[in-house]
């Protein structure tokens, strides 16, 4: 007798990109067929996502080296480069969170990975020219945001391949190992800048005017460096990864039924990404000071304006079958859990990516300077500190800790529940933020700030550890609360909003450093964490919680 699924296209052919029969909750199907395909897609997704994070986050390291090379920009202007990459990547995640259902997993991951070739190449080109205007560097930082968008589509895609009981583990592996892109970038870029690995094709070296560093220690002023390799190096991995995505990944037709021909899918992706760039550029133009922008609005207006504009543009500009697909996925905004989980993911991932972006330059400014008063007793922050720690030797450790521990957060949450884990890490983050703020205050008022560096570094490692565990727990909770049709878009949406931490953190910390009160940034973050701790208890842990410890 024919079975219910006998006339369906089999899901067992590795060469068949489109799968029409997908039943991960069916144990027999999962063990015989689904498990192999799901893990193959996962292990291709991870390095692709890693490179996305690397390209997105690399301006945090590049700006430190630009300062060491004497690029003619102020500290505030260098902070804007990191922030621009942050806001662009966050905005790209808004359309990216919907792409899997509109264009298919394999189509989306392939194209968005291949798209990274352009900003990697462009960044390498502009970094060879100290005399180019600031807007040229800002444009490249904006373009690098494509890498930030990849997280939303990657997580949305992987969530569709695995059964609910493995959501925490699978998403933790994809996100945690993908997050290693930040650490990989912070280790690889200082390394490749020390050697002219591309020969004559890679351009000429520049000479350091300040001490720099890499994972093994300091690099003295006067040493030649190839800062352009910070962009060029990623071409070596992006080309083979793009090929691997195309030939090794799959589209699940049970999730993405109407993707059309791959060229049609590519057109949808490109169209939605182009739409998302418009509000990013508009928001940045209104926010950034002259001459790049007009400086009319604050960051706290720019971010919600950017989010609302991106959603409206997508909603109004979509057409045909794409309009119906976008409208259907907008239904997630009617669910109160979408909003609660968005806030909680800002606590975890927003902090992880925000600190990853802001920490290198913050360390350089706080610990690389001897803070001494002038003859009038006014504190000055211009005297170079000869005993300063090498920023590039330490900046990678925090993101490494956060990324490494994230899969553990998902695994533990699968065992004891995601919300209780989130509650614990939120409490830790409140205390650690207050403590690190106090240490920053002490260091920024000291002629020997390096004496405070070990405690500063240790407390930030604790913060990164907590964010990593929390990243895994919050994504596990989303996988349990929402059904299979909504879980992917919600994962993408929450990651999009949390990614604005990559814009907010560098600006907030940079502004407070400029004001002479860096501790206030950390105290403000602690207040937000405390509010979200109460939110998590109300929604998921109290006696009559909406959903008990998902």
What does each of the following model-derived ranges do?
Residues 40-71, 185-189, 355-360, 505:
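Extracytoplasmic
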Residues 59-64, 274-304, 335-403:
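Extracytoplasmic gate region of multi-pass secondary transporters
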Residues 80-98, 396-409:
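Central cavity-lining transmembrane alpha-helices of secondary-active solute carriers
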Residues 148, 168-198, 495-505:
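Glycine-rich segments within core transmembrane alpha-helices of 12-TM secondary carriers
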Residues 182, 481-517:
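A late C-terminal transmembrane helix in Major Facilitator Superfamily
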Residues 235-257, 272-291, 302-323, 533-540:
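C-terminal membrane-cytosol helix-exit motif in multi-pass small-molecule transporters
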């Amino acid at each position: 007798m024919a079975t219910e699924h006998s006339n369906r296209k089999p899901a067992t052919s590795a060469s068949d990109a489109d799968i029409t029969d997908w039943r991960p909750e069916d144990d027999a199907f999962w063990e015989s067929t689904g498990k192999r395909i799901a893990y193959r897609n996962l292990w291709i997704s991870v390095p692709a996502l890693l490179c996305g994070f690397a390209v997105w986050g690399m301006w945090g390291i590049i700006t430190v080296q630009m300062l060491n090379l004497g690029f003619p920009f102020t500290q505030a202007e260098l902070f804007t480069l990191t922030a621009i990459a942050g806001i662009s990547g966050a905005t790209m995640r808004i359309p990216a969170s919907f792409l899997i259902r509109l264009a298919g997993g394999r189509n989306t991951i392939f194209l968005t990975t291949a798209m990274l070739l352009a900003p990697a190449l462009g960044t390498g080109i502009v970094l060879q020219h100290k005399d180019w205007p600031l807007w040229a560097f800002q444009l490249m930082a904006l373009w690098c945001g494509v890498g930030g968008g990849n997280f939303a589509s990657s997580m949305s895609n992987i969530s569709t391949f695995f059964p609910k009981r493995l959501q925490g583990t699978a998403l933790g592996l994809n996100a945690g190992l993908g997050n290693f892109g930040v650490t990989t970038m912070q280790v690889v870029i200082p390394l490749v800048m020390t050697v002219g690995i591309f020969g004559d094709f890679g351009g000429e070296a520049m000479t350091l005017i300040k001490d720099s560093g890499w994972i093994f220690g300091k690099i003295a002023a006067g040493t030649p460096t190839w800062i352009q390799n910070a962009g060029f190096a990623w071409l070596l991995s992006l080309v083979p990864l793009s090929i691997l995505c195309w030939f090794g990944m799959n589209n699940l037709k049970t999730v993405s039924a109407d993707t059309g021909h791959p060229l049609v899918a590519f057109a949808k992706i490109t169209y939605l990404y182009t739409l998302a760039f418009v509000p990013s550029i508009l928001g940045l133009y209104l926010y950034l000071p002259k001459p790049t922008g007009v400086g009319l609005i604050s960051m706290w207006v720019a971010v919600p304006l950017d989010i609302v504009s991106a959603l409206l543009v997508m909603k109004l500009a979509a057409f045909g079958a794409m309009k119906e697909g976008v409208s259907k996925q907008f239904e997630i905004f009617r669910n109160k859990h979408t909003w609660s989980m968005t806030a909680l993911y800002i606590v975890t991932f927003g902090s992880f990516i925000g600190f990853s972006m802001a920490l290198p330059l913050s360390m350089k400014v706080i610990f690389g300077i001897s803070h001494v008063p002038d003859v009038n007793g006014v504190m000055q922050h211009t005297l170079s500190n000869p005993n300063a720690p090498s920023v590039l030797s330490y900046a990678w450790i925090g993101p490494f800790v956060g990324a490494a521990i994230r899969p553990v957060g998902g695994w533990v949450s699968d065992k004891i529940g995601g919300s209780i884990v989130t509650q614990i890490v939120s409490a830790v983050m409140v205390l650690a933020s207050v403590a690190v703020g106090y240490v920053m205050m002490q260091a920024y008022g000291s002629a020997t700030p390096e004496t405070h560096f070990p405690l500063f570094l240790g407390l930030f490692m604790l913060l990164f550890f907590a964010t990593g565990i929390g990243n895994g727990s919050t994504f596990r909770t989303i996988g349990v609360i929402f059904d299979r049709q909504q879980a992917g878009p919600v994962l993408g949406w929450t990651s999009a909003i949390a990614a604005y931490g990559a814009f907010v953190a560098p600006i907030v910390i940079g502004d407070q450093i400029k004001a002479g009160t860096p501790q206030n940034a950390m105290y403000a973050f602690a207040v937000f964490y405390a509010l979200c701790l109460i939110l998590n208890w109300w929604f998921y842990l109290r006696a009559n919680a909406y959903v008990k410890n998902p």
